[in-house]
Amino acid sequence: MAQSVKTMVEGGKATTGPPIGPALGPLGLNVAQVVKEINEKTKEFQGMRVPVTITVVDPETKKYEITVGIPPTSALLKKKLGIEKGAAKRKEAIAGNATLDQIVDVAKTKMASMLASDLKAATLEVLGTCVSMGINVDGKDPKEVQRQIKAGEISI
């Protein structure tokens, strides 16, 4: 039976220490080799935490597979806008201002892992994350942009 280890790692910066080392040690895998492979596969997500799943396909031969997920929407938005974090009190402070093109770009990246059926729905979902992070879109409240998209005033 295949065993899996799921963890979040910073892109390109996984180490043999916790959480990976202790989780893989009992499975008999070469931890250094696995970490090297994880870092290679996650280097494009430098500075972001990404979900990684290591699945031991064959315990006897120590064959394994590494699956790298897509970072959380909030991490993609922070990287896209070059901000450290969202606003603590979104009604009082604005963490950043994104363009609609940036929001659509994040939606395209995340679409495969979302429940959204099309780009419009995915964009609305990313705008929802903007609401909670205190990020305006083209200088407007993201709720207003969502309303405009739903009303057909803005087409995606």
UniProtKB/Swiss-Prot annotation:
A single GO BP: translation
InterPro entries: Ribosomal_uL11 (IPR000911), Ribosomal_uL11_C (IPR020783), Ribosomal_uL11_C_sf (IPR036769), Ribosomal_uL11_N (IPR020784), Ribosomal_uL11_N_sf (IPR036796)
Keyword Cell wall biogenesis/degradation listed: no
UniProt GO MF annotations: large ribosomal subunit rRNA binding; structural constituent of ribosome
GO cellular component: large ribosomal subunit
Pfam families in the record: Ribosomal_L11, Ribosomal_L11_N
UniProt keyword terms in alphabetical order: Ribonucleoprotein, Ribosomal protein, RNA-binding, rRNA-binding
CDD domains xrefs: Ribosomal_L11
Family of this protein: Belongs to the universal ribosomal protein uL11 family.
Subunit structure, interactors included: Part of the ribosomal stalk of the 50S ribosomal subunit. Interacts with L10 and the large rRNA to form the base of the stalk. L10 forms an elongated spine to which L12 dimers bind in a sequential fashion forming a multimeric L10(L12)X complex.
Protein name: Large ribosomal subunit protein uL11
Species in which this protein is naturally found: Thermoplasma acidophilum (strain ATCC 25905 / DSM 1728 / JCM 9062 / NBRC 15155 / AMRC-C165)
